[in-house]
Amino acid sequence: MKVSVVGAGVIGLATALTLADRGHTVTIYDPNPAKGASYHAGGMLAPTAEVVYKQEPLFPLMQAAAAWYPELIDLTRRYTDKPTGYRTDGTLVVAGDRADSTHLDQLRAYQHMHGMEVERLTTRQARGLEPALSPALAGAVAIDGDHQLQPRAFTLALIDAARNAAVSLRTQQVHDVGTLDADQVVLAAGLGAANVTGWYAGAAPLALRPVYGDILHLRVPEHQYPLLTRVIRGFVRDRAV
């Protein structure tokens, strides 16, 4: 089967590689491969830590996506030696004060209610795992199933793997999927999907909006490296960090 994939971020590249590995003829389109949301992502694979109240329909999808990553990493490594930055050290979520610790307990109860594994730790246990944490923390939980990778490294690895799997990568913009020579089209263009036509009738069916965040890159002095091994998340004055 001939498949066209629109969008060369993590989702589009992973889809293209998987389909090519299964014997399909795949072409992927993106004017700037791996330079969109995937380039700016933090790399947390956190279906449990990123749970938000009243978004229950998303939870099975989040869990299934995270569970697929080991298989995807193995598939990528079959086609390339480039690093992915994939790590399975787990995640700690910490609380800055007593109110934040209460919030953490309430969220943990909600996560347990939905079948997610979250372990309450003492602050001493948390600092035993990550000595760089402050002794003034009010609480902590461990989420061993929430992992991490380096998005920029991973997308470059996926591009190399896809090419080695005979995926054709075309650096061009697709405005209308009806112009593509394909038996099936996969639309994986993120926010750009709202500007692609040819797959619906009437008004555009997707009401997409960006989610804003800040990322600060810090250089760790060699004598302190590695400063941390796990992903550290937290609640500080009732704000997620």
Specify the residue positions occupied by each region the protein language model found:
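Short loop/edge segments at beta-strand edges and connector loops
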Residues: D30, T122-T123, L169-Q173
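Helical element adjacent to the flavin cofactor pocket in flavoenzyme catalytic cores
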Residues: A140-V177, A182-Q184, A188, G192-N195
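N-terminal Rossmann-like FAD-binding beta1-loop-alpha1 element of flavoenzymes
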Residues: K2-T27
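Conserved dinucleotide-binding and phosphotransfer motif residues
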Residues: R22-H24, H114, A161, A165
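Conserved Rossmann-like nucleotide-cofactor binding loop
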Residues: I11, A34, G192
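Dinucleotide-binding Rossmann-like beta1-alpha1 core, especially the glycine-rich loop
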Residues: M44-Q125, R233
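N-terminal glycine-rich anion-binding loops that anchor highly charged ligand groups
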Residues: G36-H40
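Active-site substrate-recognition segment that forms the wall
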Residues: L17-R22, P31, M44, K82-R87, ...
